[in-house]
Amino acid sequence: MDAAEELFARRGVEGVSVRSVNTAAGLAAASVHYHFGDKDGLLEQVIARRGGAVVARQAELLAALEAAGDRPDPESAVRVLAEPLFELLRREPVGGARWITIVANLVAGDDERVYRIGFGPGSVQERINATVAAAFPLQAPDVVAERWLMASTSLLQLIADSADRLSADDEATARAAFDVIVGFVAHGLDGVCRA
């Protein structure tokens, strides 16, 4: 899976063939098909490998935010989505950066394959969407949803593009860079949802 993750991050999912994954991993020609069925099965496992922990952490942060009982502010909602990504980069700089790049590219391309984990009725992502909508009670929910999609897509891309700085050895510098990204996205979301 490491070879697939590296290729998907570098070339994009559509730019990678099953054959190139087998070759990069030093495997027999039918290995990916045997273990994963096809490229989509492999991609699903690549996403799930790190995605399960990310979604679980988002659920923890969301539960804490919901337990507070106050109407959420945009920055708190953005942090629920973003903080687990920052933690992933701190824990696994190379693999985390690759994973975030893959997810960011799939989300930006509106590729349904990324939505197989953490999405659907009652999912963490659906609850985050509801939290964002609650932050803007005077705005139509469909307008908030559209603007949150733009903001969250931008957030993923900014984190992916800043992975080297966010995984730097100096925690304080990395945290400061992360806080700028979160603040930028939160203020942008606030601006377009209050308009």
Predicted regions and their residues:
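Solvent-exposed, amphipathic alpha-helical segments
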Residues: A3-R10, R57-A64, I102, L106, ...
